[in-house]
Amino acid sequence: MKKHYRNYFIISKFLVLGLAFSSCSDFLNRETDSYVSKEKTFSSYELTAKNLVSVYELIPDGFMRFSEGGMFDAATDDAEHRIDGSNIQLFNIGSWTDNNNPDDIWNRCYTGIRLASEFIDNVDKVNLDKYKLDPNNTTEYENRLKDLKVWKAEARFLRAYFHFELLKRFGPTPYVSSVLALEANHSDVKRPSMDDCVNAIANECDAAAKDLELTPWRDESALGHATKGAALALKSRLLLYAASPLYVQWQNTDESNLPSSPAKWEKAAKAAKAVIDITQYSLHPSYSSLFKNNFKSSEMIFAKRYNNSADLEKRNFPVSFGGQGGTNPSQNLVDAYEMKDGSLFSWANAQQAAEPYKDRDERLNATLFYNGSNLKNAKVETATDAKDGVNKPNGTKTGYYLRKYLNEDVNVLTASNGLGHTWPIFRLAEMYLNYAEALNEYNPGHADILTYLNAVRQRAHQPALAAGLSQEAMREAIRRERRVELAFEEHRAWDVRRWKIGSKTLGSDLQGLDITATQTGGSGSSSTSGSTTTETIPASEIPAGWYYYDGDEFNGSSIDHHYWGILGDSRTKNAQYGQQQGMVQTYREEQVSMVKENGLSFARITATRNGNPPKSTNKDASKKEPWWSGGLISRETSKYGNEAKYYPLYSRIEIRAKIPWNYGVWMSSWLRHHLGYDVCELDIQEFFVKEFENYPQKYKVSQT
């Protein structure tokens, strides 16, 4: 995980900020009749219903909420994202910061909290007079009155949900139970203790559950709305987290540590059992079919429907089947799946190593594609040079592809629409595992531990665990079961943090599998650091912790040709390129010099005009043009050797440059592909005066 820092640039943000302020001003000054007022919204039954839906929409699904279709498990030891440019990779290289956090839902959560509070404060204002005063429509009036009561409870659930999402990422935050006035002074709001924050969320869950129905009571149009089970499931997850080592050991605001308490585990167990005891829920008969858009399954307690596009399949199918192979499960995860007889898989077992996917827990085949998996009457082939292998464009990095959630009948090459997808937020199997974990921590040996743990295993046709395991052995069995049962449901990242085992998991090497015609063997690449257990609140600070990669500084009395190519210098690979670039200038080596002022060394590029320029002796800058200028290329591959090659996967580049301001001057800064500018070029900054003879006031600054 080497992080690179290159000491290059700071660019002014005046134009960016100016545009942002202009846009905000336009929005705030728009005419009142261009949008629906709050008063009108909450007087209308229909608009109020839509308002509640807008709060639900702030709940993220986990399918493609990171760039390039990244999933959160690709920031754990369970997977890697194939595309290095996905922002999920910031977690893996330790480069996520308070102002560059791919999982930044701080604003999203507080938006949801505010909208939910606003809904709660106003939903009783809905005008139902036309139903109330109609003697022939009293039933509809009673139904709509009940709708408003249930909707308010749903909003309370949503407010609790967003507060929990903040808690699990940032620790305790103030519980906001009303709409905060923008003009009010909130400086006296203090960070609560962990217990106070947890209790506030739990109380909101209880209040919501009291008025929520067990099922969407009206019709199927309410599917996806929160029910009593959803509120109690949220409370279960909340109290399980609150009892876990990370949260128990959280320091209070007075710098004291919370004591470890079996009572917290007992509360977590009771909360999970309350959900289990709701008789309408049952385990889906098939693990593999549960995730094929099974929104109405009796196992789903609360889920979010994803659109019917085939984007998920396009992002994740193996490459020979038209996919982009986005999320690649790791060998670490594969090795966690047991053999069918319940024993652990081992590479030291010659028979198992020879056929690593034979006689394994069936959830392995339901979760990922491996070498030899069946798909569309064909085989997935992940050997290094095979059609889905690592050496193919968009090929897997690990030897595996994601299978869970994907509709395998979709032809991603022709289909614009798929069959829909369901993102499970709470499901019954999690409640079983929550209950088993909490029971094992405060009452090891309780019979219910095996009852519910084995129920999850037996659905996958895994043998029941035998009685008599020690608390430690049972703890490991429960954790392994959570890993495979809940894979790619956004549990792993938070489980390893709350258990405080990140240094052993997130900090370990991420393993893939190299497959050749004659042998198999693991190959590792570095995964994310396990030292960080909570996220940082967004700020505008430059992070520390970068490794400095020197060599590009302008020290000494001359340009170091090992690190810099100079346009116009015949030793430079790209001397011919950019010699004129369609402009009137000629790049010349002598226009670049080293200067030292006030103790600082820097390179100076001088642009001049010579009325009668001599012909240059340099064969690559021989044109007789009156305008002379210079150009530098960092790490340009040159005749000086391979040390000039420097193409980091991730880096922070800083350039400090003083930009001249005069007619005819064009200052530019680019990032170019190592195979040439025609492959890719990013224009970081360009500054030039255009048409200055006719329009001396006209100039242009372009920043990307």
PLM regions: where:
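Bacterial Sec-dependent N-terminal signal peptides
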Residues: 1-34, 529
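An aromatic- and glycine-enriched ligand-binding surface/loop that stacks and positions planar moieties
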Residues: 25-88, 171-173, 198, 205-207, ...
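Conserved, well-structured interaction surfaces
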Residues: 49, 53, 57-60, 84-170, ...
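Long, intrinsically disordered, low-complexity segments
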Residues: 109-112, 200-202, 291-343, 418, ...
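Short coil/linker segments at helix-helix boundaries
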Residues: 130-145, 172-191, 246-266
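Short edge-strand/loop segments of extracellular domains
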Residues: 179-183, 273, 451-461, 671-689
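Extended glycan-interaction surfaces of carbohydrate-active proteins
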Residues: 204-211, 380-418, 696-703
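GH16 jelly-roll
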Residues: 293, 388, 511, 524-704
